[in-house]
Curated annotation (Swiss-Prot):
Family per record: Belongs to the aspartate/glutamate racemases family.
Intrachain S-S bonds: none
Gene: murI
Coiled coil start-end: none
Binding site for substrate: D13, S14, Y45, G46, N78, T79, T186, H187
Entry protein name: Glutamate racemase
């Protein structure tokens, strides 16, 4: 990695959910330069063949890392993290940080039971069940997979209102069964307040954002001679023209980003 004072962080996701992870990292490291790429052309990742996903993510991330000389990559997507991290780490010479559902910290907090709210792909993946087996501390874990929650988070980011009654209906299987719930998709912290309300207001919600931010900070600051005190730049890219682009850009401006640029990579 470069020894300059200003480091570049590349955050990658299939949609805008990874912005919740970006916010946590930026809170700890406001003086870094940030690149955000969301692969909306292939969204949602849970429906992609595994080999296609591995090839696609490796090509996109490697190209952007080389073009912008990124110092660290954050895969802010649970589906991609469980499948692509080994190949990315083998192919890149910089650190790659992924997302893991926060089963262990949630289990330590729970007295009644743990709920895992994620995408259908995540709740059925063997990796997730291995996490539960190894880290659930003997606590019962209720699994709830929903793609609609992902869409709701995307809609909220574009200024649309969330139907609390619809949310309550989706989350009904967890009511009165858990006292801690894991937000197992990076989209879900974007609607954290609504989820908390829909679950009755007494369920503790846990996600991986803060832990990822601490990991990124540790890796970057160890490689820096001196931390910059100037506000970093923020650029955001999409692999296809985004849905409701004007509304999205309004929200992104509030986070300090310039308007979305379309990033096309031949052969992907």
């Amino acid at each position: 990695m470069r020894a300059s004072s200003k480091k570049k962080v590349l955050v990658f996701d299939s949609g805008v959910g990874g912005l919740s992870v970006f916010q946590e990292i930026h809170r700890l490291l406001p003086h870094m330069d940030y690149l955000y790429l969301f692969d909306n052309e292939a969204y949602p990742y849970g429906e992609l063949d595994q080999d296609v996903l591995i090839t696609r993510v490796n090509k996109l991330v490697a190209a952007l890392v080389e073009e912008h000389q990124a110092d660290i990559v954050v895969i802010a997507c649970n589906t991609a993290s469980t499948i692509v991290l080994p190949s990315l780490r083998a192919n890149l010479s910089i650190p790659v940080v992924g997302v893991v559902p926060a089963i262990k910290p949630a289990s330590l907090l729970a007295s009644q039971g743990v709920g895992l709210i994620a995408t259908p792909a995540t709740v059925t993946r063997q990796y997730t069940h291995e996490l539960i087996r190894d880290f659930a501390q003997g606590k019962p874990v209720e699994l709830l997979g929903s793609t609609r929650l992902v869409d709701m988070a995307e809609e909220k980011l574009r200024g649309e209102s969330i139907s609390l009654s619809e949310l309550e209906s989706i989350l009904l299987p967890l009511r009165n069964k858990v006292d801690v719930a894991v937000l197992g998709c990076t989209h879900f912290p974007l609607i954290k307040e609504e989820i908390h309300q829909a679950l009755g207001g007494e369920v503790t919600l846990v996600d991986s954002g803060e832990a990822i931010a601490r990991r990124v900070k540790a890796l970057l600051l160890n490689a820096m001679k001196q931390e910059s005190r100037e506000e970093g730049s923020k650029k955001i890219y999409a692999s296809a023209p985004p849905w409701q682009e004007d509304a999205l850009n309004t929200c992104l401006a509030n986070l300090g980003f310039n308007p979305v640029q379309v990033y096309r990579l031949p052969g992907v």
